[in-house]
Amino acid sequence: MAPVAAPSTSQPAGGKPMNWADEFDEPVVGDAPRIEERDEGNGVKVVIEYRTNPDGKKIKITRRVKRTLVKTKVNHEVAERKTWTKFGQEKGKAAGPHSATTTIGENVVLKMSAGNKTAEPEVDDMDKMRQQLANKRIVCRLCKGDHFTTKCPYKDTLEAIPGAGADTPEGGDGSMTPLAGMDPTNPAVAASAGGKYVPPSMRGGAKGPGEKMGGLGGMSRDDLPTLRVTNLSEDADDDDLRELFMRFGRVVRVYVGRDRETGICKGYAFVSFENREDADRARQKVDGRGYDNLILSCQWSLPRGERP
């Protein structure tokens, strides 16, 4: 078997062997792009670029760039923090956040209200009127029924009676009973039938002029067992005192002395009970008790004639 001869390699005239990669032709690189710049003023710069496209044609690209200086006002403390030297993993890094150690979130706008109080929405006048009409019940002036007076089924009968329905207007609360005080033997009713004026003392079955309007069970305001509470705070109101004293017995009346101009409590109040034993027990428990960071004083209220 004949030996296989080694492939022959061509050598240049200098005697140095040639690499096989040198046999391929090097790609022809086109002309390098030529760039021209000129300034047109007002911050406008024109950049002209001459280059060769893939088809071998020379093209001209013109760009106009306008530079505008935008000034932004930042907080002095924020600008000062940007000049701090970085430390830790960011030590030696350039200014500004780095994506490897810093995550930038969305900007949250914080709106501070004056006094941390939310402004209550203003209610329209029409809405106020609708609310008032929604809670108002229609009451007939004649029979006190839940219908208009013009549609009353007893209109022909009750209109013949003088004074019927004169006490409660249409749309009132209807708390009075029908035909209250319409006794024909009453002199006030007989006088009103003739179109004469009837004084308040003679209305509603009153016995005569000078009669004092009685309170609970015929008792006047001075006859009720009343306590005088002093050293109250400026924020005290009727509901607070009623809640404080109602645990000792039934509270008939609560009066808090207030300033006429400001409406602030003057520091005293009167509480009337139905039962004197309940009032005495409340006096012993409340007198000297701490309430709203103050020590209350609770004593019996003297009648007007016995006050010093």
Swiss-Prot record:
Keywords per UniProt:
Cytoplasm, Initiation factor, Phosphoprotein, Protein biosynthesis, RNA-binding
**Which InterPro entries does the protein's record reference?**
eIF3_g, eIF3g_N, eIF3G_RRM, Nucleotide-bd_a/b_plait_sf, RBD_domain_sf, RRM_dom
The UniProt entry's coiled-coil ranges are none
- What residues does the RRM domain cover? 225-303
Q: Enumerate the PROSITE patterns for this protein.
A: RRM
| Assembly | Component of the eukaryotic translation initiation factor 3 (eIF-3) complex.
One term under GO cellular component: eukaryotic translation initiation factor 3 complex, eIF3e
For this entry, the protein name equals Eukaryotic translation initiation factor 3 subunit G
Protein species of origin: Mycosarcoma maydis (Corn smut fungus)
Among the GO biological process terms of this entry, one is:
translation reinitiation
The answer to keyword Zinc applying to this record is no
- Free-text function comment from the UniProt entry: RNA-binding component of the eukaryotic translation initiation factor 3 (eIF-3) complex, which is involved in protein synthesis of a specialized repertoire of mRNAs and, together with other initiation factors, stimulates binding of mRNA and methionyl-tRNAi to the 40S ribosome. The eIF-3 complex specifically targets and initiates translation of a subset of mRNAs involved in cell proliferation. This subunit can bind 18S rRNA.
A GO molecular function term, named singly, is:
RNA binding
Spell out the residue ranges making up region: Disordered. 1-23
- List the subcellular locations: Cytoplasm
